[in-house]
């Protein structure tokens, strides 16, 4: 087992139970073309290979790339790309490998310190959704972040990340993975979530406007919505809009559901 590197936030998953849960959550079949981010020692890769049509694995650590190539290089349905998933242009990289595209699923144990950028890489943003979208994304991540992603309104964990992610995907909390399932154990527990990208029946008329409202609305959780949005909407106008939606004008951002955020954004767009 290679020595984990702190600068890459490496923690080797060693729980067969967790692997089983990840595999089950991914709903894999032999027609799937999978992207694995940060395969590390290859423990998940080895489980995925017999279950899918192909795997594109992206690994930043050069030493691990050498090990992965040695372990899986003989599999003709395995492609290893060395690089940073955040800056890598997968479309360009895969132009000469048509048999590995289009990727339809993502399965990954992602580093805690780049969770939000990876989510944006995979899903896009409210203002700029990822097109074409993946069919399904299964991620092992920090438990606290996973809880924030799937959180419901009026809960402590509910915030801008919840609204933004749930706008772009159905978010399912699959299971928790204790720190002892890793070597070395991280300081916090992890969780597996499944994201199913989707298009809402009633989307935002102006996604950029909704993105801005959510960002400003959650800027200070202790403040009421009219205080957080005063730079773009005066209090009287906001009160009138909320009244039309039958929402308490003293509301805070975390009290609004995704649907209410969309209705609020759309109403603001139509009357502006």
From Swiss-Prot:
MF-aspect GO terms: 16S rRNA (adenine(1518)-N(6)/adenine(1519)-N(6))-dimethyltransferase activity; RNA binding
Keyword entries, A-Z: Cytoplasm, Methyltransferase, RNA-binding, rRNA processing, S-adenosyl-L-methionine, Transferase
Subcellular localization, as worded in the UniProt entry: Cytoplasm
Gene Ontology, cellular component aspect: cytosol
Binding site for S-adenosyl-L-methionine: 11, 13, 38, 59, 84, 109
Domain of life, source organism: Bacteria
Annotated Pfam families: RrnaAD
EC category name: transferase
Role of this protein: Specifically dimethylates two adjacent adenosines (A1518 and A1519) in the loop of a conserved hairpin near the 3'-end of 16S rRNA in the 30S particle. May play a critical role in biogenesis of 30S subunits.
Cited PANTHER family: DIMETHYLADENOSINE TRANSFERASE, DIMETHYLADENOSINE TRANSFERASE-RELATED
Protein name: Ribosomal RNA small subunit methyltransferase A
Organism of origin: Rippkaea orientalis (strain PCC 8801 / RF-1)
